């Protein structure tokens, strides 16, 4: 288990190659990260995005940091340098909890083995752990798909928001993994995909993934979601998550809250598909989740086309929080969690 290659990422043993999601679907470009700062920049600049994918990417960034400082002879100095690596990576995206989960897991492996292992052995152990995180993610997503597809009926049409597919994970996907599993199980499933302004992950990534998979997909603008629900075209909504609080409040891509409100109004089940690593058991509710605000030019421009002049005020939160009362169920690899979330989430930890 020395390498991994998926649609999202490839670990070569000395570098991490990421598909550059900023250019999809028009161009398939790749970024090769040769050190941990390359990885940090790729996460920050959204070369890679999606909480599980960010977590795995950060783990490999930690390994690249270990390789970079493996020339040191002092293990304490080596550990201190990796603390700097961890801090650099952790500052990239504040909302996606998988980032911190993966870095803490890597740091624990380092600390557990530091007293008894030499530096070269530590590097090997860290690389094995990062690969384990990546391979585990794929299996977890497949189990999420298996658990979630039972909620879909043959002939259902699902609305999605943003991208929680293979591109948002190491492979297979969470929300799209549920759809993928249902199709693999012989169900006829169609999808309506919100374009997801301002970064257009739904239009650029979700539609690209689903079309490549042969799943019938219709693209709509975000402000069409309520109308297609009212027309009776939607049987279920499935989204991913970047962080889930202990009470079941869900932070996900901006616009998710609006979709959840609309789903509630129209009596449509609203499902969240996410691994247990996305649940932040230390955060009591959504009020404690930090919401990243991104560069205003993501709204001022649509790709390279200017939409408004520089004197226009812009507000660009990357995420919103959907309160637990709007969430029908949370689909995890262990089980489908239903209300009361305050009780049922804690039981899993």
From Swiss-Prot:
Keywords tagged on the record: Amino-acid biosynthesis, Isomerase, Methionine biosynthesis
GO molecular function: S-methyl-5-thioribose-1-phosphate isomerase activity
Gene Ontology biological process terms, A to Z: L-methionine salvage from methylthioadenosine
Pathway of action: Amino-acid biosynthesis; L-methionine biosynthesis via salvage pathway; L-methionine from S-methyl-5-thio-alpha-D-ribose 1-phosphate: step 1/6
Family as reported in the entry's similarity comment: Belongs to the EIF-2B alpha/beta/delta subunits family. MtnA subfamily.
NCBIfam families per UniProt: eIF-2B_rel, PRK05720.1, salvage_mtnA
Protein name per UniProt: Methylthioribose-1-phosphate isomerase
Organism: Petrotoga mobilis (strain DSM 10674 / SJ95)
